[in-house]
């Protein structure tokens, strides 16, 4: 995958993604090893994408779903020939054929393997499904059902990480293929925090028990993981609102995002953490709070200065 970005460079333009390694290292230091191929349940076979990295962790998880000869696959890794060869040999050894290809979203570490799939399995030409499809692909709509022997899969449109992001619910297991919305380890980058949090609640409302993420290990307690994600986001919102309240108490009308980071975290952090992680993350939360009409900004000397409206 070029630059090991996996599509993330488009998510937050203020984030210097190439210099983000210190933050990512904290999420990837203690990752468990995952086998290249693992039968997770009688209905779910995981094939690792052979693309490990800072953003993909152990690699993109691709899932073969069903119990019969004809099964569907969720995601296709990033175009690594090693994945295509591993998938082909695995399916051949099990006498399995593919009938549908379901893509969670547009990022390259999920869609890059499609050309290899079509080269190996040309019968799939009209069976590549994605929300907001590209040329030659079929659309996925919210609530759409895909059936193969032993598996009923329901599509769920849950944007936030990306506008087109779909999760897929395996009805027989009360399990969800969570894509990049919920990861097996750490937390996901998002395009729109408000939309993402609404999607988290919608995912929680499905009452699924287990999560099969696109990156990392199986999520044994999916509701707990989603609640933790929501709680962490809400805690950051509260932290920012409290800091803006202190600014107002000092009779200071407004504050830049850079000064707000100092207000919250102090002066002692290293500059790379401040500018490459905390500042863009704080800006992301401020934009969400502005959408909730809890904060606003004025522009002075060409810079946004934020204040609480509560």
UniProtKB/Swiss-Prot annotation:
The reaction(s) this protein catalyses: atrochrysone carboxyl-[ACP] + H2O = atrochrysone carboxylate + holo-[ACP] + H(+)
Domain of life where this protein originates: Eukaryota
Cofactor note: Binds 2 Zn(2+) ions per subunit.
Binding site for Zn(2+) 2: 109-110
Any Gene Ontology biological process: secondary metabolite biosynthetic process
GO molecular function terms listed in the Swiss-Prot or TrEMBL record: hydrolase activity; metal ion binding
Known EC number: 3.1.2.-
Pathway(s) per entry: Pigment biosynthesis
Keyword S-adenosyl-L-methionine: no
Function: Atrochrysone carboxyl ACP thioesterase; part of the ergochrome gene cluster responsible for the typical purple-black color of the ergot sclerotia. The ergochrome gene cluster produces several ergot pigments including the yellow ergochrome secalonic acid and its derivatives, as well as the red anthraquinones endocrocin and clavorubin. The pathway begins with the synthesis of atrochrysone thioester by the polyketide synthase (PKS) CPUR_05437. The atrochrysone carboxyl ACP thioesterase CPUR_05436 then breaks the thioester bond and releases the atrochrysone carboxylic acid from CPUR_05437.
Protein's name according to its UniProt entry: Atrochrysone carboxyl ACP thioesterase CPUR_05436
């Amino acid at each position: 995958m070029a630059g090991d970005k996996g599509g993330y460079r488009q998510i937050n333009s203020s984030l210097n993604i190439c210099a983000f390694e210190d933050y990512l290292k904290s999420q990837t230091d203690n990752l468990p090893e995952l086998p290249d191929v693992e039968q997770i349940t009688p209905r779910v076979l995981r094939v690792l994408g052979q693309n490990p990295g800072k953003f993909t962790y152990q690699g993109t998880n691709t899932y073969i779903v069903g119990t019969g000869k004809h099964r569907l696959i969720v995601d296709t890794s990033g175009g690594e020939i090693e994945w295509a060869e591993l998938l082909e040999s695995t399916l051949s050894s099990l006498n399995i054929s593919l009938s549908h290809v379901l893509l969670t979203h547009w990022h390259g570490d999920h869609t890059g393997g499609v050309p290899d799939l079509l080269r190996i399995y040309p019968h799939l030409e009209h069976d590549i499904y994605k929300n907001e499809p590209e040329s030659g692909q079929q659309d996925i709509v919210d609530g759409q059902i895909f059936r193969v022997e032993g598996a009923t899969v329901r599509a769920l449109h849950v944007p936030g990480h990306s506008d087109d992001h779909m999760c897929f619910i395996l009805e027989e297991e009360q399990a969800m293929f969570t894509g990049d919305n919920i990861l097996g380890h750490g937390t996901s980058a998002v395009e729109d925090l408000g939309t993402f949090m609404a999607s988290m609640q919608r995912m929680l409302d499905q009452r699924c028990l287990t999560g099969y993420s696109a990156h990392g290990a199986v999520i044994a307690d999916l509701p707990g993981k989603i609640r933790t994600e929501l709680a962490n986001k809400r805690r950051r919102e509260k932290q920012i609102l409290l800091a803006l309240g202190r600014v107002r108490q000092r009779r200071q009308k407004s504050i830049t995002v850079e000064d707000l980071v100092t207000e919250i975290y102090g002066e002692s952090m290293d500059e790379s953490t401040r500018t490459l992680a905390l500042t863009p993350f704080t800006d992301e939360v401020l934009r969400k709070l502005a959408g909730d009409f809890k904060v606003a900004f004025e522009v002075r000397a060409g810079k946004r200065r934020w204040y609480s409206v509560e």
